[in-house]
């Protein structure tokens, strides 16, 4: 199995305001990324899953990653 890099875009609602977000993750499947987003944003911002809206999940090349940690981990392999 190959670990892929995904970019996730969406919004979440906190205190009545919508906040856009863009995150990058390394995972095996798109379903794993979806769970990581819900877990990460939910725990950091205390937002329930029903207030997190994922607009897109796209697979990107490791070189295109903007997050330096994701890029470095992906390119070291």
Swiss-Prot record:
InterPro entries the record matches: Ribosomal_eL20, Ribosomal_eL20_dom
Coiled-coil ranges per UniProt: none
UniProt GO molecular function: large ribosomal subunit rRNA binding; structural constituent of ribosome
GO annotation, cellular component aspect: ribonucleoprotein complex; ribosome
Keywords on record: Ribonucleoprotein, Ribosomal protein, RNA-binding, rRNA-binding
Keyword Signal part of the UniProt annotation: no
GO BP terms, alphabetized: translation
NCBIfam families: PRK00773.1-1 (NF001981)
UniProt similarity note: Belongs to the eukaryotic ribosomal protein eL20 family.
HAMAP family for the chain: Ribosomal_eL20 (MF_00273)
Complexes and interactors: Part of the 50S ribosomal subunit. Binds 23S rRNA.
Name of the protein in question: Large ribosomal subunit protein eL20
Taxonomic source organism: Thermococcus kodakarensis (strain ATCC BAA-918 / JCM 12380 / KOD1) (Pyrococcus kodakaraensis (strain KOD1))
Lineage: Archaea, Methanobacteriati, Methanobacteriota, Thermococci, Thermococcales
């Amino acid at each position: 199995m190959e670990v892929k890099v995904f970019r996730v875009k969406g919004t979440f609602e906190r205190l009545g305001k919508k906040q856009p977000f863009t995150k990058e993750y390394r995972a095996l499947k798109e379903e794993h990324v979806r769970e990581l987003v819900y877990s990460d944003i939910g725990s950091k911002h205390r937002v329930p899953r029903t207030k997190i809206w994922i607009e897109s999940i796209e697979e990107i090349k490791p070189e295109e990653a903007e997050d330096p940690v994701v890029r470095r981990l992906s390119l070291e392999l």
